[in-house]
């Protein structure tokens, strides 16, 4: 059995490569790691489960499937954390930020996003939909600008993935209802 080629956005040179990349990303990272991680972070933040939040951060850090996306995810997560500065009176956020500054946590985007949803009392389905839209839009529009892909082809791809979000979100939420409070992400 041959080993799977690493998932790298840099290898995308045409629209078909982009389709293939997005299909793999959806299957290997987005649906089984990122969406469940946002949901778990939301759950942990709602319940004040700080140790579990740090454990989730460590598991994301150790996940080989996320390594090629770590720079971007950490950058976005830390930027989001900085934008939440006016909310540092929130104990969970304050503690997590301190751990990121001290190097005890990395500050992955799905975790910061989940905490953000919890602090702002955003309903989880709505929040996961927002996370998904931002993720797909970031990938597709970012590569479109870099590679000069046609707007119409990229818009079609974006619509395709955004239209699929409700099903994936429902899978995450329904699965979590069967065993509340447990980590849902399938780390690889």
List the predicted regions and their residue ranges:
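A contiguous pocket-lining binding segment that forms or flanks enzyme active sites
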Residues: 98-150
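C-terminal auxiliary extensions adjacent to catalytic cores
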Residues: 131-188
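Electropositive phosphate-/nucleotide-binding environments in soluble metabolic enzymes
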Residues: 12, 16, 32, 67-70, ...
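Glycine/small-residue-rich interface belts in oligomeric ring/scaffold proteins
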Residues: 1-50
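Inter-helical turn/loop segments and adjacent helix faces that build the functional surface
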Residues: 8-16, 87, 91-95, 119-127, ...
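Short secondary-structure junctions and interdomain/linker hinges
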Residues: 29-33, 45, 67, 87, ...
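Internal, conserved structured core segments that host functional sites
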Residues: 35-43, 47-120
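Hydrophobic alpha-helix position signal
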Residues: 2-8, 84, 117, 143-144
